[in-house]
């Protein structure tokens, strides 16, 4: 009987990788725009391949050695092609479009520069920081850390659950029911005759008997719990490569976090970074004072009501859950998540606790 070989990729082109990770509606779009504008950071990319490898490993469908080798190959391939603009997105309206990048001309020049054999040496000289936005990845990211070691930094963006609830409810309606599932390039699992997002492994029956807003609440809870467990378990191993940033604190006073991002990535802010921050309205007077991007509107964003304070904005979002038919049990879960988040991240921020409820 043949013994299965160990799968490896010993050589690696990748110098540094930054993953901006978080749940739907947490504010990744804002963060990726700002991080991209820092020195040496590459144009924003998305990697369902990376997310799916980690998901399959979590589900026991891919062995550790295979997952780690695939991650090293995939990251090297993306970097290699990015350095020749083979992966550059020229669709003007896309968030990952080169037209939204502060170094637009860099990617145009790469189209006409020498590639292939000269790319590895250019990577060594320029030390580019590969940059991805990822979704709900931190809890399942052990294969990434094992594959890439200190080359990877993961920025976890967290946000008040009530500010993420509308988008995640819309996702349950638009993405996880036919025909929306055809545009979702992530792993699903089979339960009875239904397919479910793999994030609901272990709570399949709860998912199936819940309505969209309840599914959003229970999924949010599970991801949050798994993520906190991962951080606790691997604090000693990977803690220096994980930077958790509360959205609310960042948009009100970003400077400490910007310095920490620079330290984690061994890079720095530039005048272009400050220009992008101003465009994103950071810092801002109120948390809800976002900018009216089309992507935000499609995800349920509405401009804040001027007469409402921060606490009243939270009350309005909680009412959304009730109006969408959330059960008492689901509301209890939501309220507990909100309380825990407020105590952990917002206890010293004036006006951001729902004490009036």
Task: Please state what every model-predicted region is.
Residues 28-41:
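A conserved segment at the C-terminal end of the G1
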Residues 133-135, 148-170:
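Conserved phosphate-donor/acceptor-positioning beta-strand/loop module used by diverse small-molecule
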Residues 175-199:
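Long, charge-dense
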């Amino acid at each position: 009987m043949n013994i299965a070989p160990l799968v490896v990729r010993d050589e690696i082109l990748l110098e540094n990788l930054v993953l901006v990770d978080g749940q739907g509606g947490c504010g990744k779009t804002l963060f990726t725009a700002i991080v991209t504008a820092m020195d040496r950071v590459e144009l924003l990319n998305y990697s369902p391949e990376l997310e799916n490898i980690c998901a399959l490993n979590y589900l026991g469908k891919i062995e550790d050695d295979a997952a780690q080798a695939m991650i090293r190959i995939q990251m090297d391939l993306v970097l290699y092609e990015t350095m020749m603009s083979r992966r550059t997105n020229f669709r003007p309206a896309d968030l990952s479009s080169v037209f939204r990048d502060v170094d637009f001309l860099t990617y145009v020049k790469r189209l006409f520069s020498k590639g292939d054999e000269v790319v590895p040496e250019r990577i060594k000289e320029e030390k580019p920081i590969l940059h991805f936005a990822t979704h709900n990845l931190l809890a399942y990211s052990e294969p990434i850390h094992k594959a890439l070691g200190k080359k990877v930094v993961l920025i976890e963006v967290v946000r008040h659950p009530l500010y993420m609830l509308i988008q995640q409810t819309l996702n349950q309606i638009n993405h996880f029911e036919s025909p929306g599932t055809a545009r979702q390039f992530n792993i699903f699992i089979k339960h009875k005759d239904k397919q479910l997002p793999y994030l609901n492994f272990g709570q399949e029956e709860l998912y199936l008997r819940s309505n969209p807003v309840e599914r959003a609440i229970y999924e949010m809870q599970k991801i949050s719990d798994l993520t906190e467990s991962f951080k606790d378990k691997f604090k000693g191993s990977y803690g220096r490569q994980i930077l958790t940033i509360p959205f609310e604190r960042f948009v009100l006073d970003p400077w400490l976090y910007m310095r920490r991002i620079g330290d984690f990535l061994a890079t720095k802010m530039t005048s272009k970074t400050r220009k992008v921050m101003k465009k994103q309205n950071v810092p801002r007077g109120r948390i809800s004072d976002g900018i009216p991007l089309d992507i935000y509107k499609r995800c349920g964003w509405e401009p804040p009501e001027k007469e409402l304070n921060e606490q009243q904005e939270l009350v309005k979002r909680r009412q959304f859950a009730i109006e969408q038919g959330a059960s008492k049990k689901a509301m209890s879960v939501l309220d507990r998540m909100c309380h825990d988040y407020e105590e952990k991240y917002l206890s010293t921020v004036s006006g951001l606790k729902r004490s009036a409820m």
